[in-house]
Amino acid sequence: MKMLDYVQLAHVRMGANLERSSELVAQLVDIIQSGSFDALRIVASGSSRHAADCARDYLQDALQMQVSVVTPEAFVDFEHTYPQHALNIAVSQSGYSTNTIAALDYMRAHDMAAVALTANVEAPIKEHTDIVLDYGVGVESVDFVTLGVEVLVEYLVLFGIYGGQARGTIDAKGVAQRLDDLREAIQANAVMCKTAEAYVQDHMLELSEHTPAMVVGNGPNYGAAEEAALKLSETIKIPAMHHEGEEFVHGPEMQIVPGYLVFIVDDPQGSERLANIADALSNVTTKTVLLTAHPKGRAHEVAVPQVAPLLSAIPNLVFFQTIAAMIAERLKSWDVHPYLDAVSKQMEVKAEGYEESVNALKAKAAECYGM
């Protein structure tokens, strides 16, 4: 299984998880219902944090409580006091992330309510918390995770829906409507797989140039922008930055010259401001893209299916994942520079046994998917 295979598998896995949605999140719903929690704090880094940022606004709307998303380092050093009376959810897809494990150790030492979410409940993370939950990824054997990102967004959304029902903030009719909205977002993700693949095929040469990239998005799509920048950086090995819309035009845009990659993710309801920014920048660099559910026929637009606004990251993520997977495969840019590789052990981010776990996942992938 290659990275692109997992990108294209995501909507299938999300669809399967939707069919068992109540069961999937039942334990976490029971936990938040049984405690006197006033807030939710998600502690995660990298792609898991970006997925949480994609779902944060949805969670706040559904649960009607404050939801914060912080890195493990920030949590341990600064962000552990407020919000008070919070349920802490620490996320590590691999279950081997040393920074997330350190955050869980802090929670345990300070008697803080904590749950770990992972795709591998037998990983070392299980030794550092009392409650470890599988969020439904199944098998993903590629380091540059994509399937796990969308599945985590979906899991958090489902937790918001059923948690909201348990807390009395969503009635039965609201649950049904929200599940339908999620189903439509998953279908939109499938559509965007094809849209993105066609886009890359049509723009292979310009996407293959080693130039900086800037990705812009607001709300849930800020999480998508974060993840897009990460994927472009780690796979194609280009400098990639992420910004909110107005932050972008308050200085960062001043570096743009012809040849830059600029991706602007439109607000779900359609933003005249973002559309105007994209129009302006298309006169500076021909590699400007406006990802929008409200296209007006301009050459730099890529159309996205309309979905419920707070679920917009679900179809938008796949566009960037597809670019990263296809261009990295074409350029064979998976490996880091030899000098960086030589010192990588000094910057290790995974607990002992991680490489063996990846090999085990590859064997499972061959068994599960026949690839």
Predicted regions span which residues?
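Short, well-ordered loop/turn and helix-capping segments at boundaries between secondary-structure elements
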Residues: Q165, I238, P268, K287, ...
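Short alpha-helical basic/polar micro-motif
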Residues: D105, L230, Q321
